[in-house]
């Protein structure tokens, strides 16, 4: 996908990038056809974030690219401080472009006396002056309802779809790595015109190991596991092993957000997975031969262009 440049109509537009993923910001700006605007991002001696906008933004429509990935708290705070600086500099509007939305997993009260942190983060973003959110594959779709401003939740499946078709797999089938991800996997299966199977993880009794039940048949199939994020990689690695034991020819995992915490890379290297495909929504620090990274920068660039020109975003995915 290639964003149509709009240099002739960019007088009221500026795009900034935080320090969370500068390479992504540069790639988006390249697709749009003009450079990032400048800001000095630093820290005081005690670790407090200090930001100075280096050019006039008075009356401009601002887009800030900043995934709230590791270190989550620093990157979130940097975003909020930058928004405050821009608002106090008389920006006309401020849109936060969050390829990865951190704190999305705490979207409900799953136990007594716990926070709903996703809602709290939404409140913070709105209170500081963010007027629109562009993000991708939210962990829970209902997070869009935590905001009282427009939220464009993009689908990473648009790049995965093209990649899978280029592989020319002989007997592909889509799989959800757990019951909770069925809706997401079904959506992708429908897009691809493929069947769906489910890996059902159960613990029959306390202190017993988990049993991986597969709903459907993976025998002699090229299985494509679909998830929104890969964190510790435990779930997809266990699912891949169960699928191979049932006779799957190959197992590939698609995960929009490569969080890859702890020993995730080691698990993937030693797993039954043949390939793991992720996007560059988060900077990939560690390398692994099994991991393929697809860029979504052109997708975000085109969405930014469409929003700036008041064009439909949904038509990209239909």
UniProtKB/Swiss-Prot annotation:
Catalytic activity: D-ribose 5-phosphate + ATP = 5-phospho-alpha-D-ribose 1-diphosphate + AMP + H(+)
PANTHER family membership: RIBOSE-PHOSPHATE DIPHOSPHOKINASE FAMILY MEMBER, RIBOSE-PHOSPHATE PYROPHOSPHOKINASE 1, CHLOROPLASTIC
Subunit and interaction comment: Homohexamer.
InterPro entries attached to this UniProt entry: PRib_PP_synth_CS (IPR000842), Pribosyltran_N (IPR029099), PRibTrfase_dom (IPR000836), PRTase-like (IPR029057), Rib-P_diPkinase (IPR005946), Rib-P_diPkinase_bac (IPR037515)
Native source species: Helicobacter pylori (strain J99 / ATCC 700824)
Keywords: ATP-binding, Cytoplasm, Kinase, Magnesium, Metal-binding, Nucleotide biosynthesis, Nucleotide-binding, Transferase
Active site feature: 201
Pathway annotation from the record: Metabolic intermediate biosynthesis; 5-phospho-alpha-D-ribose 1-diphosphate biosynthesis; 5-phospho-alpha-D-ribose 1-diphosphate from D-ribose 5-phosphate (route I): step 1/1
Annotated binding of D-ribose 5-phosphate, by residue: 203, 227, 231-235
Annotated HAMAP family: RibP_PPkinase_B
Keyword Nucleus: no
Binding site for ATP: 46-48, 105-106
Stated name of the protein: Ribose-phosphate pyrophosphokinase
One GO cellular component term: ribose phosphate diphosphokinase complex
Enzyme category, top tier: transferase
Locations listed in the record: Cytoplasm
Underlying gene: prs
Cofactor(s) this protein cannot do without: Mg(2+)
């Amino acid at each position: 996908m290639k964003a149509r440049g709009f240099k002739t109509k960019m007088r009221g537009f500026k795009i900034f990038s935080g320090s969370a993923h500068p390479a992504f910001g540069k790639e988006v700006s390249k697709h749009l056809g003009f450079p990032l605007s400048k800001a000095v991002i630093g820290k005081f001696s005690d670790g407090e974030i200090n930001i100075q906008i280096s050019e006039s933004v008075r009356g401009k429509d601002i887009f800030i690219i900043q995934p709230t990935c590791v270190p989550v708290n620093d990157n979130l705070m940097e975003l909020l401080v930058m928004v405050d600086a821009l608002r106090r500099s008389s920006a006309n509007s401020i849109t936060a472009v969050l390829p990865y939305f951190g704190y999305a997993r705490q979207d409900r009260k799953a136990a007594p006396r716990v926070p709903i942190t996703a809602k709290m983060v939404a409140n913070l973003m709105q209170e500081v002056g963010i007027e629109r959110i562009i993000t991708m594959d939210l962990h829970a779709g209902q997070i869009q309802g935590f905001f009282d401003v427009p939220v464009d939740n993009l689908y990473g499946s648009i790049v995965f779809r093209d990649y899978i078709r280029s592989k020319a797999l002989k007997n592909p089938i889509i799989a959800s790595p757990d019951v909770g991800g069925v809706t997401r996997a079904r959506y992708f299966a429908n897009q691809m015109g493929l069947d769906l199977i489910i890996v059902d993880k159960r613990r029959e009794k306390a202190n017993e190991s988990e049993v991986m039940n597969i709903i459907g048949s993976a025998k002699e199939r090229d299985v494509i596991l679909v998830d929104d994020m890969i964190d510790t990689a435990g779930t997809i690695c266990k699912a891949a092993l169960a699928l191979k034991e049932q006779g799957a020819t190959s197992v590939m995992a698609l995960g929009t957000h490569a969080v890859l915490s702890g020993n995730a890379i080691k698990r993937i290297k030693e797993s039954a997975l043949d390939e793991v495909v992720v996007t560059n929504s988060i900077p990939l620090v560690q390398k692994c031969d099994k991991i393929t990274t697809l860029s979504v920068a052109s997708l975000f660039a085109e969405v930014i262009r469409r929003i700036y020109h008041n064009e439909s975003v949904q038509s990209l995915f239909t």
